[in-house]
């Protein structure tokens, strides 16, 4: 007869009963959070390299190019705190997943944009999705790694992904 033990503790027979709140693949969750953080930061700066090509292909002048760059950053900064509260309400995993899907769709729209107006609109949506992804990826790490030591290590890896 076995003695019942709390979740996350070792049983008398040497087995281990996992905590149901702990995901089965914390490495996969950390990888997704790091990649999400990386693309959010990368997309804020990498568009600067493409500005001459964008101006040649789509036109729009200097003001249009400024909106291509600043629209993303503006939406990201404006919605970051609200998106963090949204992540707390709907759950980090759900918010991160939906933010990532929206980010990918907006990225595809950027690539397919026929003109500068469509590109600016897609960049605004991208910035909104990035605002959802950033705080929810950090909250996801907090949920996946409950121990202080493992959480600190995971947050360090996450921060390096955005550096």
Placement of each model-derived feature along the sequence:
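Transmembrane-helix bundle of Major Facilitator Superfamily
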Residues: 2-163
């Amino acid at each position: 007869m076995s003695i019942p033990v709390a979740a996350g503790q070792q049983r008398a027979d040497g087995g281990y009963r996992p905590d149901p709140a702990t995901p089965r693949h914390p490495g996969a969750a950390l990888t997704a959070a790091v990649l999400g953080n990386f693309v959010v930061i990368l997309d804020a700066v990498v568009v600067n390299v493409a500005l001459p090509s964008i101006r040649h292909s789509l036109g729009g002048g200097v003001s249009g190019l400024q909106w291509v760059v600043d629209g993303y950053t503006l939406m990201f900064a404006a919605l970051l705190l609200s998106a963090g509260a949204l992540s707390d309400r709907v759950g980090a995993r759900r918010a991160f997943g939906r933010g990532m899907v929206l980010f990918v769709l907006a990225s595809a729209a950027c690539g397919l944009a026929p003109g500068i107006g469509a590109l600016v609109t897609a960049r605004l949506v991208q910035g909104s999705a990035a605002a959802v992804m950033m705080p929810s990826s950090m909250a996801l790490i907090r949920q996946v790694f409950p121990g202080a030591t493992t959480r600190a290590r995971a947050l360090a890896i996450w921060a390096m992904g955005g550096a």
